[in-house]
């Protein structure tokens, strides 16, 4: 039998995607017609180039609980909702994502926002993270490919790039829980875009 050639279908942004404002924020919405899984992304035009401690702050937050939930209870609750979340900062943008069953997304977002705004600091966890990061940096200096990658970044982006996107060891040692959590809370107040699929 002969297979008929497939005709290309071009995206019609007016028909295939809805754009609207919600509480002053741009929202791009595409309905998932395949299954009940939804993805909600908050995209910020701010990354590690403008705030080098973002990823450390996100990493720290992932170990914390709130006054009403421990980190383990948050993980269990998200599991029960069939949802997950991630916080990632790239060099020029940051993405806070919540994925899972569409019907449970509002509850999952509540949990994530509660964690962001009400995280209970834990100095032991912070000190362990700092120690791990300092050890990782020491190990990277002994690794040839890490040194080569740093050299490539230096050549491509210039000498200021590394100092702009990386905090020095002394600054790392002096970071406080309040600074890290404040960085995330301040990010939440920045203008951002919402992608919902």
Model-flagged regions — what are they?
Residues 120-126, 174-175:
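Peptidyl-prolyl cis-trans isomerase
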Residues 35-62, 66-118, 130-138, 143-171, ...:
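M16 family metallopeptidases and their MPP-like homologs
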Residues 27-30, 83-87, 181-184:
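Short beta-strand/turn micro-motifs at beta-sheet edges
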Residues 1-2, 7-12, 17-54:
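His/Glu-based metal-binding/catalytic segments typifying zinc-dependent metallopeptidases
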């Amino acid at each position: 039998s002969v297979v008929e050639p497939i005709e290309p279908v071009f995206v019609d942004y007016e028909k295939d995607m809805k754009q609207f404002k919600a509480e002053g924020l741009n929202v791009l919405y595409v309905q998932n017609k395949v299954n009940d899984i939804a993805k909600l992304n908050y995209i910020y035009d701010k990354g590690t180039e403008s705030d080098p401690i973002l990823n450390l702050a996100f990493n720290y937050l992932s170990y914390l609980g709130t006054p009403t939930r421990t980190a383990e209870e948050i993980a269990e609750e998200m599991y029960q909702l069939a949802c997950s979340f991630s916080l990632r900062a790239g060099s020029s943008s940051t993405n806070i994502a919540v994925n899972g069953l569409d019907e449970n997304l509002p509850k999952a977002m509540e949990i994530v926002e509660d964690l962001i705004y009400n995280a209970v600091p834990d100095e032991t966890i912070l000190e362990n993270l700092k120690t791990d990061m300092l050890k990782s940096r020491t190990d990277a200096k002994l690794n040839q490919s890490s040194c080569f990658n740093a050299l490539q970044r230096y050549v491509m982006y210039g000498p200021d790039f590394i100092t702009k996107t990386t905090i020095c060891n002394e600054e790392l040692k002096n970071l406080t829980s309040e600074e890290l959590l404040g960085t995330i809370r301040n990010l939440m107040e920045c203008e951002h875009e919402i992608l919902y699929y």
